[in-house]
């Protein structure tokens, strides 16, 4: 028995797969989902979405967003979903350095910098 995982970005549906298990990178930790899980809605963090499919494991970096689980369907709404194999460690390191150099003298700048650093760190972890 499997569950369906659908990942949607503003541009298109990035993924629509049957999986035995889905691990979601929630903002406060990882959440595992299998068939029969109780319905829920939650906020995603920056991290790796993992699926265990019949053909093997799949991993995607997701750029925050929201997840909904209902009736053995996992719906993920995110800004970006990138297969981990396509991430470049050097580029992720550069992005993190740029985020750390952002100004943070006002509350608005600090909030923007914090989000950029969290995003870059998540992408760097995923690229390893």
Curated annotation (Swiss-Prot):
One CC-aspect GO term: plasma membrane
Regions that span the bilayer: none
SUPFAM superfamilies in alphabetical order: Epsilon subunit of F1F0-ATP synthase N-terminal domain
Sorted UniProt keywords: ATP synthesis, Cell inner membrane, Cell membrane, CF(1), Hydrogen ion transport, Ion transport, Membrane, Transport
Signal peptide: none
Key word Transport present: yes
GO biological process, one term: proton motive force-driven ATP synthesis
Disulphide bridges: none
GO molecular function: ATP binding; proton-transporting ATP synthase activity, rotational mechanism
Bilayer topology annotation: Peripheral membrane protein
Family membership: Belongs to the ATPase epsilon chain family.
Subunit structure: F-type ATPases have 2 components, CF(1) - the catalytic core - and CF(0) - the membrane proton channel. CF(1) has five subunits: alpha(3), beta(3), gamma(1), delta(1), epsilon(1). CF(0) has three main subunits: a, b and c.
Protein name as annotated: ATP synthase epsilon chain
Organism: Rhodopirellula baltica (strain DSM 10527 / NCIMB 13988 / SH1)
Lineage: Bacteria, Pseudomonadati, Planctomycetota, Planctomycetia, Pirellulales
């Amino acid at each position: 028995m499997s569950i369906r995982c659908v990942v949607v970005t503003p541009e298109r549906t990035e993924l629509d797969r049957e999986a035995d298990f889905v691990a979601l990178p929630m903002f406060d930790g990882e959440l595992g989902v299998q068939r029969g899980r109780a319905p829920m809605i939650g906020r995603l963090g920056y991290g790796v979405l993992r699926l265990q499919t019949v053909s093997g494991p799949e991993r995607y970096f997701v750029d925050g967003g929201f997840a909904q689980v209902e009736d053995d369907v996992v719906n993920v709404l995110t800004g970006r979903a990138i297969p981990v194999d396509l991430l470049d460690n050097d580029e992720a390191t550069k992005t993190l350095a740029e985020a750390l150099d952002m100004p943070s003298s006002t509350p608005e700048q600090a909030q923007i910098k914090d989000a950029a650093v969290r995003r870059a760190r998540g992408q760097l972890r995923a690229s390893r």
